[in-house]
Structure formats: structure tokens, C-alpha cells
């Protein structure tokens, strides 16, 4: 499956060139934004960790081993990419214990930048956002056109697709999810079950968003929509008055799409009909999610790009800096600009 099948159409037209992303880990930097002041005391040791070429789960295992504790006592807010330079928080539960010597966890792929005590463990999803610094190298394209498109993106946002990373290599997770759905069964292994259910929900959401992008309504509220603020999980129905709410124009308020699950959809009108039609086209996945007991949720269709800045360190490098809400994908921004090609290859675009 290619990225058009997994995501959908671009909002701003065809790619304006090509580039390489992640030639080195430093080309994709992520800083977790976590607004939790540490109390300085408590049974939980929090660690601000920088990792390079290491995924979050591997880092957690290394931290647990160095601390001499079971892996289940190590917590983190969110998963970060392996092929990147990332900084994020971990917590380790140490009831009645002094701070352990964590040096055994450190090497050239993991550094502990600071530590502190807190009364509570770090919860999944506790981070509010992620800050990104991306460096696109071997850039081939019209920089004036790229600048103009970036200005549009800063003003209007982008479609909030789940990135291709969610779906595995060539969409393999979607294939696996469909096979389980046809069998009306769930994987016994918890991680596999969670991964495939998440894949199915994300895929259905992307198909709804793709239809809204195709009809030009992805950033426009219409009667029957459910609206949500950027950083809120709650939503409310849109009537005529809500469709002209000025907060829509300043990218504070957005139409939403379905995270499929059990229960009736609270959408109505044309929005309800579109979402039901998309789900009917993937009836096995829809029913699988309902029968698995997934709850009906919503996700904003439009993604505002916080603090977007860019410059060209050299003629063939574009550096982007921006902030995204937790759970949103930096690569969908890159996709609105250029096609990505593998390192060492600049003629044939690849799916990323």
C-alpha cells in the first residue's frame, strides 16, 4: 500500500520537489513538551533522557536494568521514533529506595540529562506537545514555491492524517488487521492487539479525512460536524452559529473525524452520512473495532502548526522548526512540501 492509499490526497497540490529526511539522527529531532512541575520528593524518580537511534521501549528496558527494577515500574508519556535524536521523560518507581546509579544505562545512544523526584509516576499521554527540528537534505525544488506553501500552511494548517509509520512497512499492519477482522478474532498478545486495533482506527480516520480533503471541507465546519479545540478531547455539535465561530478562523477550533468504536456516532447530516459510507466500505474493520469494545472518540481533522519557522542552511538543505500536539505526525507536514527519497538516491521518490 502506498501513502496515497494509507493517507489520502495532499491539501496543497503536488509535491514541490524531493529531499532526504533522516540521513542522520540529528536531521530529525524531537523534544517532548511536558508541563508538570516536579515536587522534588516522592517515590518516583523522573529522568530527562536523550536518545539516538534507540526507540522508547528499548530505552525503558535499559533504564529498568540499570535501576534494578522490573520493566513494569518504568513509565513514559509517549513513543518516540528510533531513527531520530529525541529527548523525553521517563519515570521509575522506587518506593523507599535511594536514587540508583544509572550510569550503566548510558552510552553513545542514551544520555540522562537530568533527574528529579515526584510523587506520581509519569502517565501515558501526559505530554501536551512535541517540538520538532527537521533538516531536509539533498533538497531539489523551487525554494520560492516552498516558501509560499509554508506560509499557507502556517496560516491554514494541514490535514491531520496519521502518518505512514502508524501502518507498518507498506501498510502491513492494515493487512494484518484486516485478516484478524475477517476472522472476528483478536491477537492474544496485548501489544499486538493494541497495535492492530490502533492501526484499524487510524486507517478509517484517514479515509474519512481523505474524503473531506477531496471535497475541500477538511478545514471548514459544516452543520452536523462535531467541533473540538486543538488540545481537547471533548467536542460539541456544530449548528449554523457554530459554523461561523471566529475561533475556527484562527485555528483554535476544528471539525473532527471519527476514532471508530462502539456506540452511535454523534455526528449528523452530511458529516454523518460521509462517515457511515466510509465505514461501510470497511465493514469488517468497523465491526471488529466495535466488537473489541473500543470507545467512540474524535480527532481534529485540521492540524495547526505551532511556531513554524524555516530557513536554508545551504542551497540544498531546508530546516523546519515547529510544535505539534501530542499524537500528531511531523512527516505529514513534510509530505505537503516534497517527496522523500532514500539516503543516497535522489531520482525515485519513496513512500515514507
Swiss-Prot record:
GO terms for molecular function: RNA binding; tRNA pseudouridine(13) synthase activity. GO terms for biological process: tRNA pseudouridine synthesis. It catalyses: uridine(13) in tRNA = pseudouridine(13) in tRNA. It holds the Pfam family TruD. Residues 157-303 form the TRUD domain. Belongs to the pseudouridine synthase TruD family. This is tRNA pseudouridine synthase D. NCBIfam families: PRK00984.1-2 (NF002153). CDD domains: PseudoU_synth_EcTruD. It comes from the Bacteria. It is an enzyme of class 5 (isomerase). Responsible for synthesis of pseudouridine from uracil-13 in transfer RNAs. Its EC number is 5.4.99.27. It comes from Pseudomonas fluorescens (strain SBW25). The active site is at 81 (nucleophile). Keywords: Isomerase, tRNA processing. One of its GO terms (cellular component) is cytosol.
Amino acid at each position: 500500500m502506498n501513502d496515497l492509499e494509507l493517507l489520502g490526497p495532499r491539501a496543497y497540490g503536488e509535491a514541490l520537489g524531493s529531499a532526504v529526511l533522516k540521513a542522520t539522527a540529528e536531521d530529525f529531532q524531537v523534544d517532548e513538551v511536558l508541563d508538570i512541575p516536579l515536587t522534588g520528593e516522592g517515590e518516583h524518580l523522573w529522568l530527562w533522557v536523550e536518545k539516538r537511534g534507540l526507540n522508547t521501549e528499548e530505552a525503558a528496558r535499559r533504564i529498568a536494568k540499570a535501576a534494578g527494577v522490573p520493566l513494569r515500574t518504568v513509565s513514559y508519556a509517549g513513543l518516540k521514533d528510533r531513527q531520530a535524536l529525541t529527548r523525553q521523560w521517563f519515570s521509575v518507581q522506587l518506593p523507599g529506595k535511594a536514587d540508583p546509579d544509572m550510569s550503566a544505562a548510558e552510552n553513545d545512544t542514551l544520555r540522562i540529562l537530568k533527574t528529579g523526584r515526584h510523587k506520581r509516576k509519569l502517565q501515558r499521554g501526559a505530554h501536551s506537545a512535541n517540538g520538532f527540528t527537521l533538516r531536509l537534505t539533498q533538497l531539489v525544488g523551487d525554494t520560492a514555491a516552498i516558501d509560499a506553501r509554508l506560509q499557507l500552511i502556517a496560516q491554514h494548517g494541514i490535514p491531520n492524517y496519521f502518518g505512514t509509520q502508524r501502518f507498518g512497512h507498506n501498510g502491513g499492519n492494515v493487512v494484518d488487521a484486516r485478516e484478524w477482522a475477517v476472522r472476528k478474532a483478536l491477537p492474544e498478545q496485548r501489544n499486538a492487539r493494541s497495535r492492530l486495533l490502533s492501526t484499524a482506527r487510524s486507517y478509517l480516520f484517514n479515509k474519512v479525512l481523505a474524503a473531506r480533503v477531496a471535497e475541500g471541507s477538511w478545514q471548514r465546519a459544516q452543520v452536523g460536524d462535531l467541533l473540538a479545540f486543538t488540545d481537547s478531547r471533548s467536542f460539541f455539535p456544530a449548528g449554523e452559529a457554530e459554523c461561523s465561530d471566529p475561533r475556527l478562523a484562527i485555528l483554535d477550533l476544528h471539525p473532527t473525524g471519527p476514532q471508530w468504536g462502539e456506540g452511535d456516532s454523534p455526528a449528523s447530516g452530511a458529516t454523518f452520512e460521509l462517515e457511515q459510507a466510509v465505514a461501510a466500505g470497511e465493514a469488517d474493520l468497523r465491526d471488529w473495532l466495535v466488537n473489541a469494545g473500543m470507545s467512540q472518540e474524535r480527532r481534529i481533522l485540521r492540524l495547526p502548526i505551532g511556531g513554524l519557522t524555516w530557513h536554508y542552511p545551504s542551497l540544498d538543505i531546508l530546516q523546519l522548526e515547529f510544535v505539534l500536539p501530542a499524537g500528531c505526525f511531523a512527516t505529514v507536514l513534510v509530505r505537503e512540501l516534497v517527496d522523500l527519497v532514500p539516503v543516497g538516491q535522489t531520482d525515485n521518490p519513496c513512500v515514507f
